[in-house]
């Protein structure tokens, strides 16, 4: 199973509310018609994410297919062309991007729709190979994060090797997804020794020359 994560900013002049409504209703009804689509989740940035200005993204769209082959086949269909044709109605196409990933579950528990969802966009530290980055993130850092008591679910989405062929560099090397019961629980997690251990490990594999972009979302499982 492969998972594509698309990073979305609303089109200029569109309100956050109108963007969310259009995405959840009109656009979702088009996407679910894609051949081969196994699962579709919309992750909408919560209102508090706008208190101090614009967040990194207004949301991310997550879609699952059985394989990259199935995904490519779907992209050749009229249904996919309909999806693309609808995007300018609510998305800023100058800022849209995506990664194709494989999930590595670090803490496996159900993600209830009432939970808040922390989505972090991760770039490996300069000079580190993709293989070493993924190995450390999954084998060392992941178990540290899973120990934080308030964490309900924790999934790492590792960008697939094909994204690096011919010297290419994807927008991010991975996406970390962590679910909490509430924003209060998320804030409380930052006071724990387990969280401090997570932060202390980050320079070992993450580019810390700038803050890690993130959004906090509520999720809508469309399919």
Annotated model-derived regions:
Residues 1-223:
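Macromolecular interaction modules
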């Amino acid at each position: 199973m492969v998972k594509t994560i698309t990073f979305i900013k609303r089109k200029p002049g569109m309100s956050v509310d109108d963007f969310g409504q259009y995405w959840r209703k009109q656009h979702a009804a088009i996407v679910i018609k894609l051949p081969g689509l196994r699962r579709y989740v919309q992750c909408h940035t919560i209102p508090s994410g706008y208190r101090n200005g614009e967040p990194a993204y207004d949301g991310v769209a997550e879609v699952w297919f059985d394989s990259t082959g199935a995904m490519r086949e779907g992209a050749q269909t009229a249904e996919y062309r309909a999806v693309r044709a609808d995007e300018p109605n609510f998305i800023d196409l100058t800022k849209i991007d995506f990664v194709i990933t494989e999930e590595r579950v670090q803490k496996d528990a159900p993600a209830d729709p009432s939970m808040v969802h922390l989505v972090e966009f991760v770039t490996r530290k300069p000079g580190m190979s993709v293989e070493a980055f993924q190995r450390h993130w999954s084998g060392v850092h992941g178990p540290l994060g899973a120990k934080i008591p308030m964490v309900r679910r924790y999934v790492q989405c590792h960008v697939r090797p094909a994204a690096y062929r011919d010297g290419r560099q994807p927008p991010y090397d991975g996406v970390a997804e962590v679910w909490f019961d509430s924003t209060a629980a998320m804030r409380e997690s930052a006071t724990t020794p387990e969280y401090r251990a997570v932060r202390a490990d980050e320079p070992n594999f993450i580019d810390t020359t700038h803050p890690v972009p993130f959004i906090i979302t509520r999720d809508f499982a469309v399919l």
